[in-house]
Amino acid sequence: MPIYFRNTPVSAPFMFDSIGNHWIEGGTCRPEGYPHYHYLQTESGCGQIEIQGKIYELRENEGFLIAPSIPHSYKKKSDLWINAFATFTGTLEASIPAMLQNRSVIWIEKEQGQQIAAQIATCVDEIAAHGQQDSKFLSLNCYNLLLNFTDCVNGPAHMQ
């Protein structure tokens, strides 16, 4: 279950503050939200996430991108809930809301989730192999991942 946290000052336009996959999740409660955009996706099992007073099931390859400071909590619904995740920062972090049409929550369906999971795995593998030395590569991959969320801004009807 690899997990990486940024260990250098932010100098790139977009950067992962943290990224990981194959993470065994028990649950988290964030009444003040998280300080950065936070993406959470189920790799296997099933979880339950509460955002803005609404409860959703998070099944395999489904995910949520949550804006900073949005209260939320999540917990496992199955015996084992395994996740991929990424949190985003960077010198252009303030431009992310405009990229996402100021949406505070974006639902990711299974098809898009498969692509995002593959991108997260590529980034995790790259960090494992080469560390965080190539900030341009990581920044480019971070931006590429953020672009996936712009494709999902209008999301399914139950999220409108």
Language-model features and meaning:
Residues 55, 68-92:
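Ligand-binding loop in jelly-roll beta-barrel domains
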Residues 1-57, 62, 77-78, 103-107:
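Generic protein-terminus/edge-of-domain signal
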Residues 22-25, 90-94, 151:
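Active-site/binding-pocket entry motifs
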Residues 91-108:
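Double-stranded beta-helix
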Residues 29, 49, 95-96, 157:
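Short acidic, gly/pro-rich beta-turn/loop elements at beta-sheet edges
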Residues 91, 111-160:
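An amphipathic alpha-helical interaction segment
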